Amino acid sequence: MLQALLDSKDFLALTLANPETLGDEFSFTLGEHTRVEVWNTGVIVFEPAQAQGKDVILSCGVHGNETAPIELCNTLIKQLLQQKIIAKQRTLFLIGNPLAINNGTRIIDENMNRLFSGEHSNPPGLVNPERVRAKKLEAYVDRFFKGAAAGRQRIHYDLHTAMRASKHEKFAIYPYRPGRAYSAEQIMFLAASGVDTVLFHHEPTTTFSYFSSEQYGADAFTIELGKVYPMGQNDMTRFIAAQEMFMRLITDKPLALEPFSADKVNLYQVCRVINKHFDDFEFTFAADVENFRSFPKGFVLAREGGQEIKVEQEFEAIVFPNAKVPIGNRTVICLIPSVAPDVR
């Protein structure tokens, strides 16, 4: 395994050729500046000899068909392995769901991004590949963040692409963080990365980014970088800004961020989540409606069990509508413009 990686510098290829395990961990050094550790398939750590003050996690492929972030991360990994760039911050890359990537599908059995914060082990337990992998990913995050002295800034960007078109092509979900202000620096970092829209979540969830935020105090985000396309069919020029900013972060180059200003970004507050309670749940709008489409108060969004679900606020925008989820799961997130969020 070691020699294959040293020869190819292609960690994604190694991961997809061994989607369940790489066997024993292995490590090696790049020059005299970086120790590289491979903990398992899809799990690679870059430990600078003289690390600066940030611990950075870039995760991708939690959903197997969201390929642009996978290609983006593999490019950064390849540049690090080729020593075209040199890590100055401790950095962990996670390729989340290799089995689903090989399968060309979003999932194998279950949506992995609903299985963190221990949800993987709640009934029915570790019964499928996503649940088993989610538990392992939590352990890798724990090991990484606890592998350095306390007091360092912890960052986790969980990278995705969306299944549908969007009014705002790139957007981020800021996990619920009661008692903690939102980071102005992080919001402007996202903006510099081309991610000009942020959704503030209103309650705990079982997503990967919420896990890192809540358990480790990380500046963590679920970041949607565009639309789903098959591997190799992404227009990677659309991700130049994101790749550049991630590279600058990892290599400790100046970020040159603008001061925070609410008029430079689109800020939304999650006002509610609509879950599915009956098999006959259906939306009233077209199946191809774009993310952030707005509807007026009183508009019937959906019907189920003989009841109508209406827009409650003056206007509500929607993201991630999906009527085909299992009963009990989220069908859509409803948003309102965010007014004076606590950003510092």
Swiss-Prot record:
Transmembrane segments: none
Key words of the record: Arginine metabolism, Hydrolase, Metal-binding, Zinc
Catalytic activity: N-succinyl-L-glutamate + H2O = L-glutamate + succinate
Pathway(s) it belongs to: Amino-acid degradation; L-arginine degradation via AST pathway; L-glutamate and succinate from L-arginine: step 5/5
Enzyme Commission number, as recorded: 3.5.1.96
Cofactor(s) for this UniProt protein: Zn(2+)
One MF annotation (Gene Ontology) recorded for this entry: zinc ion binding
Chain positions recorded as Zn(2+) binding sites: 63, 66, 160
Lineage: Bacteria, Pseudomonadati, Pseudomonadota, Gammaproteobacteria, Alteromonadales
Cofactor binding, per record: Binds 1 zinc ion per subunit.
Function: Transforms N(2)-succinylglutamate into succinate and glutamate.
SUPFAM superfamilies according to UniProt: Zn-dependent exopeptidases (SSF53187)
Protein name, as recorded: Succinylglutamate desuccinylase
Organism: Shewanella sp. (strain ANA-3)
Keyword Amino-acid biosynthesis among UniProt keywords: no
Family, similarity comment: Belongs to the AspA/AstE family. Succinylglutamate desuccinylase subfamily.
Positions of the catalytic residues: 224
Superkingdom of origin organism: Bacteria
GO BP, sorted A to Z: arginine catabolic process to glutamate; arginine catabolic process to succinate
